[in-house]
Every structure is written in C-alpha cells, then in structure tokens.
Amino acid sequence: MINNVVLVGRMTRDAELRYTPSNQAVATFSLAVNRNFKNQSGEREADFINCVIWRQQAENLANWAKKGALVGITGRIQTRNYENQQGQRVYVTEVVAESFQLLESRATREGGSPNSYNNGGYNNAPSNNSYSASSQQTPNFSRDESPFGNSNPMDISDDDLPF
C-alpha cells in the first residue's frame, strides 16, 4: 500500500505549536493549495488542507514559516475520529507532514528583492571581490542571494546551439 502526499501551498495562518504531556512538539497548520483548473468565472480556486507535523520539524516550522509563506511538504494522509461534547462522532482527515521546505527566500517573503546582494547576511560588511588561486576562498553566497542576479543576457546565435 502507498500513502504518500506532496503539497506545495501557502500557509493560511501561523502554525500552532503545542506540546504533548510526554513533551513531544506538535504543530497544526493549514495550506492553501491552488487547483490546476479555473472555475466557470475564470478564477483559480484553492483547497485548504489541514496538516500536522511532529517533533523538531514542528518547532522549526513554527519558528520559520509564518502566514503566507510558500511551503512544500511531504507526508501521508491520516484519518481519525473522536466524540465531541455533544456526544457525536467527528471524523477528521489531515496530512501528517514528515518534512517541510520553505520555497522562497526571506527577502521575497518580506517584500525585498530576491536578487539583492546582502554580503552573506552581514550588513555593512566589507566585501573582498578579489580571488586568487592561493587564497583558497570560495564565494560566500547566502541563502537569499542569487549568484546570477547581476549577470547580463548572453548573445548566442542559433548556429552556436547544438540542437
């Protein structure tokens, strides 16, 4: 049997982080996932999918992913049921996320330019743009920085392409 879920969507609210009596971290959140088609009025609808994540991943999600963040998750579908205060049986279907990944940079989420150079996360740090073979330095690209952000378009003729 296979029970595997992969979702990419935006968080509809900040994750709610709680701890079980045995001190296990658990976070609940929901993702708005766009459908692949448009409705009759030409608008793209979204599904709002309830998710839960456990342990260290729950703490990381609660600390780093906020409402509106574009998140990718992998996990599985789980159904459970309980009896509510009115004595009725309630069935819940949710995705148990086993891992997550933030899919956009912090600068993009906070309204900045994703291609802006930020000196590897150190503001106002002097930059050393000279590289010598003996220095053994590698460029320090931060997570938010594109190494090709300041490049110019290449001038290639069709004759130079191998296909």
From Swiss-Prot:
UniProt GO BP: DNA recombination; DNA repair; DNA replication
Keyword Nucleus listed: no
CC terms in the record's Gene Ontology section: nucleoid
Region (Disordered): 106-163
A single MF term (Gene Ontology): single-stranded DNA binding
Entry annotated with the keyword NAD: no
Alphabetical list of Pfam families matching this protein: SSB
Record's keyword terms, sorted: DNA damage, DNA recombination, DNA repair, DNA replication, DNA-binding
Domain of life: Bacteria
SSB domain residues: 1-104
Renumbered ranges of motif Important for interaction with partner proteins: 158-163
InterPro entries with a match to the protein in the record: NA-bd_OB-fold, Primosome_PriB/ssb, ssDNA-bd
Biased composition (Low complexity): 111-135
Role this protein plays: Plays an important role in DNA replication, recombination and repair. Binds to ssDNA and to an array of partner proteins to recruit them to their sites of action during DNA metabolism.
PANTHER family with a match to the protein in the record: SINGLE-STRANDED DNA-BINDING PROTEIN (PTHR10302:SF27)
Subunit structure: Homotetramer.
Protein name: Single-stranded DNA-binding protein 1
Organism per entry: Streptococcus agalactiae serotype V (strain ATCC BAA-611 / 2603 V/R)
Lineage: Bacteria, Bacillati, Bacillota, Bacilli, Lactobacillales
